[in-house]
Amino acid sequence: ERVSPDGVVSLKLTQGRVADVEVKFLTKDGDDVDENDNPINGKTRDWVITREISIKSGDAFNRNMLERDIKRLYGTQLFSDIKVTLKPLPEQPGDVVLILGIVEQSTGQVSGGLGYSQSQGVFGQVQLQDTNLFGRAWNLGLNVTYGQYGGLSNLTFTDPWIYGDNHRTGFRGSLFLSQQVPQVFQSEDNGNIRTLKDYEDNGGRKAYETGRKYGFSDNDKVPGSVNKADDEYPNKSWFNYEGDSIALRKIGGNFAFTRPLNGGDPFKDAPWRVLAGMGFENVRPINFSADSRPYGVASRKIKSGKVKNKDIVCISYNCADSNYLTSFRFAATYNSYNDPTNPTSGSFFTASTQQFIGINEDSPTFNKLRTSYTQFFPVDWLKLHKGCRPKPGEAADCPQAIGVQVKAGVAIGDMPPYEAFCLGGSNSIRGWYDCDLAVGKAFGEITLEYRFPLISIFSGEVFMDAGTDFDTQKDVQGKPGLLLNKDGSGVSVGTGVIVKTPVGPLRLEVATKDFTDDYRFNLGIGWKF
């Protein structure tokens, strides 16, 4: 600033300070005014943007903090571009106004497609969504699916950060109407549990199909209805076999609050997150004509019109036409992944409890406990991808890792069979079809998987899955897993190719059953874990 007579130079250093933070909306071309020189009006509320900015008025300017703030803004997926401008204030030397130039992206979406699932068969799907409803970053979506065996309508609402809450508490709620064929009552190779039009249990060891001839009826046909057959032969148990696949119609909703454990600092990285919520639904077992069907029987168990009484299954709790399920759910998660989409290191832990409360005689009381732990270990084994062989001075781009996942769960209390744990499928033990390995009151799974890049958008995987029901299929109401000869435990090894797509990884896999030549192909969306 000045030089003393002795030749000493005095310098006055002023630390940059943020006087204010302003939001300015821009067009895709970067203009802040339209063709009539009017300012561009954005859809997003200013506070949705500024709440992600940790630098406040009066704070010293910090480039690292600003970079983290901009990264958080991009993480909302509401903006396609963000331009930062520092505007000096001549009357306040050293002070600047932080101007955020925001280019909004389209947040309304309409999509559709075709697919296949075991519970719905071939289905069509239409989805409507707005991820920035009223400019408040609210997400409202409607998903309608209609297939061969049923359909689903689901209306969801999400507020990722409740206004004014320093803990970043979020809210999610949904209402749904669905009709699906549950895999609990299905088997790939051993038949299915089919609907009974009517059933009367008079305590006999066997039940007899109506409308057939029997020795005790002098080889005359017994009446074709259960009521009439029961009147003529009251000491026998009777059933009227219909033979439809069992479907469940569900109407209900749920809501939950989630919160990272950040100590009230919304900008603090918090690996722990907690959830508390409530659910309610009416579940009604039906046939394909939407008639109530609370009873079913494994078709393979019927011999000459006779079946053991114990092999007739109550589809619902208390053999009721419908069940009301009311539950409270609490969960905690820990996430230290280095990459949210394709991690190569870090761990993920989750534990939850869901308590169902009986509100009438046809409403069960039970609890479901679940937990899982996943760990990734980075490796550098295969170098097929060119990013695994960088030239001198280049950074390696070779995400490969060993992933280990352990999952377990147990149900305590009187649980309806459709709430049992299923083993088998693309997100379980991959050598079996969905729910084709076990239907139990407890389960355990472990997966060991090696992931590695191949070329371009293709990656490979080699895996081994193992799972068990801990011999609990016999404890499920009606024992549907045992009636359908489901194995209960098994090991599956396999390999697959993963394709990166705009909607996420697409898995094409082949897996075997218990090291035999019995294998299945699998198509899945997203990594298994």
What would you call each of these model-derived segments?
Residues 108-120, 472-489:
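Small/polar, glycine/serine/threonine/aspartate-rich low-complexity segments that form flexible
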Residues 475-529:
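C-terminal beta-signal and terminal closure region of outer-membrane beta-barrel proteins
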Residues 54, 74-78, 449:
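Sec-exported extracytoplasmic/periplasmic mature domains
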Residues 2-12, 98-100:
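Short glycine/threonine-rich beta-strand-turn micro-motifs
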Residues 7, 12-53, 108:
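Sec-exported N-terminal periplasmic low-complexity segments
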Residues 1, 10, 286-290:
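Interfacial loop/beta elements and low-complexity acidic/Ser/Thr-rich segments
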